[in-house]
């Protein structure tokens, strides 16, 4: 089965198996396939895919990198480029990224820059990669722990999503992807939330496939309105402004999803402080939805997970100054929630600049609660 979920802003296919020759039908055997993955997936998932490609007449090469966010560096990026150069890979070859968000971010950036661009196919193997990282063409690497400081917009030729590959993952890893599902529900499509009410239901393939499909459609719908991230696409940054600042400070000691979960809670508190959010019930609902999947909802939760001494308010404010959205203001603009399923719009803009005083007040209240509860 190959189901076309959408073809805008690029084709996204839901498949029941990656061992389907029809997936390769649009590719020419005149040029090689270059797979980029990590060392674990190279042994776990890739062999049958490589065998199929070879049986169809393709020349195949595999490049592997270590697992983890710490791999997402300039050194890794240049090493992959050097390997492509050593192999004398032509720009007509197709680069296929197989893995989670880290792999797809790096592989997409390599594809965008090798010989000024080569075809790229994403095969996401985690939930967050299936519903978020593989969609929309954003790619890049970190610089000195600053998230995605160097990167580009480069749409993939296709995304192939096989929900069955999630069976390789522990339950906790699946829950990490739920954070992005919840984000989509709160900024654009509240109809996603009923699919998240029973965590056990997601153990069923049909329920999980439906969740993936709805989230793919949600993100694709937002992206196709604003591929270059100048307007509507900015709502996808909900939770990520503070979340990325926290990731920078924690230096790999917390998963991306945990930072984003707390980021969403804090940015909803900002929305309430500014009178943008229509009801405190939005915050209560968000917290319950996150807790259902054992995701953190406070700074205290993060520090308990990371087992490191707390930072202070000034350190978080300083980390925020490196945000990519920052303009000629002390702080970057923030996405605000108006109601569940609706990100706020400010005269056609979807991010709001706030005063340092208001953010400091929200953060100080959070630190006070951490030290006194």
From Swiss-Prot:
Q: Which reaction does it catalyse?
A: 7-phospho-2-dehydro-3-deoxy-D-arabino-heptonate = 3-dehydroquinate + phosphate
- The enzyme's main class, written as a single word, is lyase
The lineage's top-level taxon is Bacteria
Q: Which residues participate in Zn(2+) binding? A: 180, 240, 256
Example GO BP: amino acid biosynthetic process
Keyword Nucleotide-binding attributed: yes
GO MF annotation: an example: 3-dehydroquinate synthase activity
CDD domains per the record?
Answer: DHQS
**One Pfam family named in its UniProt record:** DHQS_C
Cofactor requirement = NAD(+); Co(2+); Zn(2+)
- UniProt: NAD(+) binding residues: 67-72, 101-105, 125-126, 138, 147
**Which pathway does it serve?**
Metabolic intermediate biosynthesis; chorismate biosynthesis; chorismate from D-erythrose 4-phosphate and phosphoenolpyruvate: step 2/7
Assigned protein family: Belongs to the sugar phosphate cyclases superfamily. Dehydroquinate synthase family.
> Matching NCBIfam families, A to Z?
aroB
Q: What does this protein do?
A: Catalyzes the conversion of 3-deoxy-D-arabino-heptulosonate 7-phosphate (DAHP) to dehydroquinate (DHQ).
Name-wise, this protein is 3-dehydroquinate synthase
- Gene source species: Chlamydia trachomatis serovar D (strain ATCC VR-885 / DSM 19411 / UW-3/Cx)
């Amino acid at each position: 089965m190959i189901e076309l979920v959408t073809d805008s802003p690029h084709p996204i296919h839901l498949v029941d198996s990656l061992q389907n020759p029809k997936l390769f039908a649009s590719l020419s055997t005149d040029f090689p396939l270059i797979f980029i993955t990590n060392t674990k997936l190279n042994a776990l998932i890739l062999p049958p895919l490589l065998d199929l490609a070879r049986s169809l007449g393709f020349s195949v090469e595999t490049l592997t990198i270590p697992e983890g966010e710490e791999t997402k560096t300039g050194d890794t990026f240049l090493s992959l480029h050097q390997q492509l150069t050593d192999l004398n890979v032509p720009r007509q070859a197709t680069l296929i990224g197989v893995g989670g968000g880290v792999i797809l971010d790096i592989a997409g950036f390599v594809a965008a820059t090798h010989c000024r661009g080569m075809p790229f196919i994403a095969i996401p193997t985690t939930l967050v990669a299936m519903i978020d990282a593989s969609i929309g063409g954003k790619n890049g690497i970190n610089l000195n722990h600053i998230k995605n400081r160097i990167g580009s917009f480069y749409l993939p030729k296709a995304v192939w999503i096989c929900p069955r590959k999630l069976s390789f993952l522990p339950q906790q890893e699946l829950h990490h992807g739920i954070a992005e599902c919840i984000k989509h529900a709160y900024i654009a499509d509240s109809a996603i939330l009923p699919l998240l009410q029973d965590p056990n239901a997601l153990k069923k393939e049909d329920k999980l496939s439906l969740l993936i499909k709805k989230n793919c459609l949600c993100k694709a719908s937002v992206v196709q309105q604003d591929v270059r991230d100048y307007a509507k696409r900015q709502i996808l940054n909900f939770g990520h402004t503070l979340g990325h600042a926290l990731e920078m400070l924690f230096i790999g000691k917390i998963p991306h999803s945990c930072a984003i979960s707390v980021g969403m809670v804090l940015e909803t508190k900002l929305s309430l402080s500014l009178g943008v959010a229509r009801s405190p019930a939005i915050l209560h609902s968000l917290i319950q939805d996150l807790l259902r999947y054992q995701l953190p909802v406070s700074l205290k939760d993060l520090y308990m997970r990371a087992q490191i001494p707390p930072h202070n308010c000034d350190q978080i404010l300083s980390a925020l100054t490196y945000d990519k959205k920052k303009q000629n203001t002390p702080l970057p603009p923030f996405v605000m929630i108006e109601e569940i399923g609706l990100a706020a719009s400010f005269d056609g803009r979807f991010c709001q600049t706030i005063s340092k005083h208001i953010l400091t007040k929200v953060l100080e209240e959070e630190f006070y609660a951490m030290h006194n509860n």
